[in-house]
């Protein structure tokens, strides 16, 4: 389909090939835009493998599960692929209708078998790549002529700002962390700092929101609260926190992360403490939103400063919310995505 007159030829139909309903890469990079894109003349038809509509399915059927979506996508004007399509080996990518666009929010060439060999070939077979940050864009720019940087955005209609009254009335100082259990290794790097802080501050506690408990070694158990992740309660869980933390190692994999934990905390009006790695550093530079912490002493100092200053917590939290509204708002990002999709048909 060629759009000779872009102003009058829309709407267009976009086939979105995604994965399980709770997979973050599908939820926040693609699915949350379906309604918003329709407002910009892009009608999205999402194709979720039947076997993954409620759960993630590992194993050898990873490639075969996408075949029905591949055939159904032939009726669309263009195809939008979740990064879950990148397995570290080529499967059906070359058989998809063109234009085809790959969305990536992780350094997928590092975490897959044979990824550093196959991912470049997959990227070359794409007409465009949408990357979650500049680090990813630089990599894919070596293999695809059209690469766009589009950050993972926040649905501000859903992620409400925690009320100032609640922040001011809370007696406990709740250090919050949310994420999948696979990322507990980054918490391990600051476990000794957390343990010391929790023991030395009577009103402090640590709140974990995840899919599985963390088997920590040093934390005082009476100061740790585990909350099983629940899609319907993920926002209210943020409102129970005083500060959100995002510790990371500094390596090629973490530089590909898109700072989504930080953005979730900020959308709720929480101050943040984060390792200044990759996109985290970029987000920290956009406002007076919290602290960068690069050593045990810096983590301890940041926690201590916020613990003793409720007004600073609120100040940082409000500034963080404004940064999200300005730079990471799903309503705004939807317009950027629509322009990208239309450009593939009008060029």
Regions found by a protein language model. Name each.
Residues 2, 110, 154-172:
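Acidic anion/phosphate-binding donor-loop and adjacent secondary structure
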Residues 21-36, 40, 156-158, 168-240:
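Conserved catalytic-core segment of nucleotide-activated headgroup transferases in glycan assembly
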Residues 135, 153:
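Carbohydrate-associated surface elements
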């Amino acid at each position: 389909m060629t759009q000779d007159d872009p102003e009058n030829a829309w709407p267009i139909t976009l086939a979105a090939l995604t994965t399980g309903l709770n997979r973050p890469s599908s939820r926040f990079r693609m699915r949350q835009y379906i309604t918003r894109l329709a407002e910009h003349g892009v009608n999205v038809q999402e194709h979720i493998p039947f076997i993954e509509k409620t759960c993630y399915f590992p194993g050898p059927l990873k490639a075969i599960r996408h075949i029905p979506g591949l055939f159904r996508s032939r009726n669309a004007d263009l195809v939008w692929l979740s990064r879950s399509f990148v397995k570290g080996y080529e499967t059906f990518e070359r058989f998809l209708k063109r234009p085809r666009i790959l969305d990536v929010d992780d350094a997928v060439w590092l975490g897959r078998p044979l990824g550093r060999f196959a991912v470049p070939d997959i990227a070359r077979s794409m007409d465009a790549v949408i990357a979650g940050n500049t680090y990813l864009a630089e990599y894919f720019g070596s293999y695809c002529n059209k690469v766009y940087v589009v950050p993972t955005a926040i649905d501000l209609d859903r992620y409400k700002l925690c009320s100032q009254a609640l922040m001011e009335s809370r007696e406990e100082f709740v250090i919050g962390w949310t994420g999948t259990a696979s990322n507990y290794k980054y918490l391990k790097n600051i476990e000794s700092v957390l343990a010391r802080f929790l023991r030395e501050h009577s009103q402090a506690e640590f709140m974990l929101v995840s899919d599985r408990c963390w088997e920590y070694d040093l934390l005082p158990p009476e100061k740790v609260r585990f909350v099983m992740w629940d899609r319907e309660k993920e926002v209210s869980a943020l409102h129970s926190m005083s500060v959100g933390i995002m510790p990371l190692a500094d390596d090629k994999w973490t530089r590909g992360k898109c700072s989504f934990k930080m953005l979730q905390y900020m959308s709720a009006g929480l101050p943040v403490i984060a390792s200044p790695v990759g996109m985290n550093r970029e987000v920290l530079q956009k406002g007076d939103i919290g602290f960068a912490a690069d050593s045990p002493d810096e983590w301890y100092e940041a926690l201590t400063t916020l613990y003793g200053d409720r007004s600073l917590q609120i100040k940082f939290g409000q500034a963080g919310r404004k940064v999200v509204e300005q730079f990471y708002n799903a309503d705004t990002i939807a317009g950027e995505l629509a322009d990208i999709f239309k450009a593939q048909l009008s060029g």
